[in-house]
Amino acid sequence: MGLESSENATGAVDQQERLDAYVAGFVDGEGCFHVALQRNPSTRGGWQLVPEFRVSQDAARIQVLYLVRARIGCGTVRENHRRSHDHTYVLIVRRRKDLLQRVIPFFERNPLVSCKQDEVVTFARIVRAMERGTHLRPEGFDRLAEEALTMNGGGRYRRVHRQFTIQNPQRPHAEHGAPIDAP
């Protein structure tokens, strides 16, 4: 009987490891580790860094988002682009404590296979620097913003506005009229 109990415990551990590997693989294909640069007039420089982990999925497979949320232990599932009619949902985690204590450790234990793992490393470095208050000093904010703007292939708006934003963070929209970062 003792052997059977031990085998069940080992089987449960194996099942959890396989489930975590599934979640990591799913996120590798459908997830995003992102640090937005958002205008915020109430901050000293008029801008803020907003780290976010997100995973999207069609409404027919929304249960996978709930599985990911259960495995990482945090996040909110909601409609993706509420004005859109594409019937997709998204799991979003923005709370820094959850990113630091749940999301980042999960993906450090279960690294992604693709080059997206580089985004995880950069994301973790930025979020940890923010936790230390690096973004509260102008030179620290500029360094983290520059690093954030290199993530996710530069993004459409990021490529266009990157240099202008870093050189003049108070007025990046004055001449261009486009958002720095569109989700």
PLM regions with names:
Residues 1-183:
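Sequence-level preference for short, compositionally simple segments enriched
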